[in-house]
Structure formats: C-alpha cells, structure tokens
C-alpha cells in the first residue's frame, strides 16, 4: 500500500515539474502579453474618465486583481475608489450577491459615483458597468494596440478579444476590508478545526470584493433591481487559505488535468470549481500532516472523487456561500459527460500512476 502511494506521489511530482511548470510558464508569458494590451486600454480609459483608475500593477511577478479562468481566458478586476458613503447590504435574497445603499443622512452629491445611484438610493453595478463598457469601446479604437484588440459584442460584460486568441474580461469592483458578509456567516464551521482562529482572523480582515458582473444565480432573468446588485468574490481569502503544505501543488495538478482533459463542450468545469473542491478537502483533512508531500496522491484522489459526486448530483456549493451553486445554468448533459470523463481520469491515475506520463 505504502509502495503504491509512494509510486503515485513520485509520478505526480514528475507531472508537476514537467506538465504543470510548462503550463505555468506558458500562462505567465500570455499574461505579460495580455496585460500590456489591457494596461494600454485602461490608460486610455483613465484619460477620458479619471474615476476609472487602472489598478493593474505587477507585484512580485504577479498582477494584482488578475485571475486565470483558463489558459486563453482571464479576468482583470479594476478596483474603484470611494465606496465610503454606502452601506453594504447582504440579506441573502440574491445568492452570491449584495447591494450598496446610500447611508442614511448622506447626500447623493457626496458620492464620487452620483449619477449611478438609483432612485431608491442603490449604487447600480449595471449602470457603472454600462458606462465603463462605453469608455472601453472608445479606448480600444484609440489605443496603440487597436489592430490586435476588439470588444466582444452581445454581452453586458466588458470583454476584449486579443490577437484573436485570448479573451479578457475587465470587471469594475470595490474592495471591502474589515467586514464580513452575513451570507458567509456560517464560515468557519464550528465543529471543524481547520483553518484555526488565527488564520480565520487573517482571512476575515482580508475581506472580499464586490464585482460588477452578471450573477451566477440570475443569468438570463435579471430584473433591473437585481442587475443593480454586486457579485461577492473572495479570491484573496481563498488564496490565503491555500498556503502551506502541498495545497498549491495539488491545485496546480488539478488545473493542468482540467485544461488537458476536462475542457468539454458546454464548459461544465473551470479552474474555480477545482479551487472550491480543494478548499472542501482542506476541511475534510484539517491536520497539517494531511498535507505533507507524501499525501499528495491521497488528496488528489479525494478531490477527483468529490468532483465526480458533485457532477452526478449536479450541484457544487460555493465554499463561502453554500446557497450559491457553481453549476447553476450548466447543461445537464455537459455535467454528465464531465462526470464520466473525470471517472476515467481518476481510475487511470489510481490504477496506473505511470499513465500520468501520457496525461
């Protein structure tokens, strides 16, 4: 048994140093190329409208606010200033979303975003995005990369196609620190010792983001009130939780397997599903020793089996917001074929670790 585990860990480490590192290198090169274009577009936006200041900065070879959806698709979060005059209201009526309401006694004119406040005093995510979309469209025509970048039409999101190969979504957002959403109040679960009180305090202080984008749970049926809502995002909190042990390596292997074998019609699975299931695996195995290098094979196997279970049940709850289903709106047939393909993959890796040389 121990020999079989050791063989799997050896093969996974080999896979990590060959396949995963090559993937990381290729993506890093793409990110540099894409960010040159996006920075140029955002610089042009800022000239037209100084309220939209580019926050895309490189820190320690990483771009703050950039998320890799898949090797050809990225999301850049553009942090906006001055949320101060609004209260954060999160009553759970829209899973995964919250609203920003003008604080009592505050005048509209005190807000930097006065013309985007609705009659009932809400700061409209949709109105801000619509204005930003117009500015980006103008900037694309003026910027020095105009020959290689185009706006993607037929969407309320701000999406660019770069060199006909890459898609970048630029999402206006507010950073919320020092508060924690009521809809995530059940975290951490009281009977689970992970991640421990110090890490919990760090994560809650890190806070979350409010994004101006279409909400998972409302796609295709948004009323105007609902489309004024902001989408909750916890990227920094999640990244902080995944520090230490073989968690990062495990995520890297999962993303590489997804890119190479689970990029299926109907797009049932993305990197975020993998990250979510890794967080649940951390809860199931709360001891740090469960995340030693020698346990990499067991952890990966556990996550793949959990993924199959979620695909078969057609439900994948968000880690912090369990009322939000990350499979919402995905075609059942796509989830079914992803379950079959994941099962083939898991069986292959478990029964024949050497197959990783070909995967």
Swiss-Prot record:
UniProt-listed Pfam families: Mab-21, Mab-21_C
Keywords: Cytoplasm, Developmental protein, Nucleus, Repressor, Transcription, Transcription regulation
Domain of life per record: Eukaryota
One Gene Ontology term, aspect cellular component: cytoplasm
Subcellular location: Nucleus; Cytoplasm
Biological function: Required for normal development of the eye. May promote dorsalization of the developing embryo by antagonizing the ventralizing factor bmp4. Functional antagonism of bmp4 may require interaction with smad1. Required for gastrulation and subsequent neural development. May function as a transcriptional repressor.
Protein name in the entry: Protein mab-21-like 2-A
Protein source organism: Xenopus laevis (African clawed frog)
Lineage of the species this protein comes from: Eukaryota, Metazoa, Chordata, Craniata, Vertebrata
Name of the gene: mab21l2-a
């Amino acid at each position: 048994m121990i020999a079989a585990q050791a063989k799997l860990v050896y093969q996974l480490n080999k896979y990590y140093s060959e396949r995963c590192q090559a993937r990381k290198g290729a993506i890093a090169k793409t990110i540099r190329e894409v960010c040159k274009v996006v920075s140029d577009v955002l610089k042009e936006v800022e000239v037209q409208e100084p309220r939209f200041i580019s926050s895309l900065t490189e820190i320690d070879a990483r771009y703050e606010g950039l998320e890799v959806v898949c090797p050809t698709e990225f999301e850049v979060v553009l942090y906006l200033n001055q949320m101060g005059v609004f209260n954060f209201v999160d009553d759970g009526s829209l899973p995964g979303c919250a609203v920003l309401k003008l604080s009592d006694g505050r005048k509209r004119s005190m807000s930097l975003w006065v013309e985007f406040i609705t009659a009932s005093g809400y700061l409209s995510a949709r109105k801000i995005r619509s204005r930003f979309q117009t500015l980006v469209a103008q900037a694309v025509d003026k910027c020095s990369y105009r020959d290689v970048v185009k706006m993607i039409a037929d969407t309320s999101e701000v999406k660019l196609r770069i060199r006909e190969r890459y898609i970048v979504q630029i999402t206006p957002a507010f950073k919320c620190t020092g508060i924690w959403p009521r809809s995530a109040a059940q975290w951490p679960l009281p009977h689970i010792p992970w991640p421990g009180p110090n890490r919990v305090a760090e994560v809650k202080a890190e806070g979350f983001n409010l994004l101006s984008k279409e909400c998972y749970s409302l796609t295709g049926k948004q009323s105007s009130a609902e489309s004024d809502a902001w989408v909750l995002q916890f990227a920094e909190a999640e990244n902080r939780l995944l520090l230490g042990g073989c968690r990062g390596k495990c995520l890297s292997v999962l993303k590489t397997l997804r890119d190479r074998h689970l990029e299926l019609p109907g797009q049932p699975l993305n990197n975020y599903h993998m990250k979510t299931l890794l967080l649940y695996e951390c809860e199931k195995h709360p001891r740090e020793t469960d995340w030693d290098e020698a346990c990499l094979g067991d952890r990966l196997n556990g996550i793949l089996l959990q993924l199959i279970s979620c695909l078969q049940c057609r439900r994948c709850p968000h880690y912090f917001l369990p009322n939000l289903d990350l499979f919402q709106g995905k075609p059942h047939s796509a989830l079914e074929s992803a379950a079959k393909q994941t099962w083939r993959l898991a069986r292959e890796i478990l029964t024949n670790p050497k197959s990783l040389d070909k995967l």
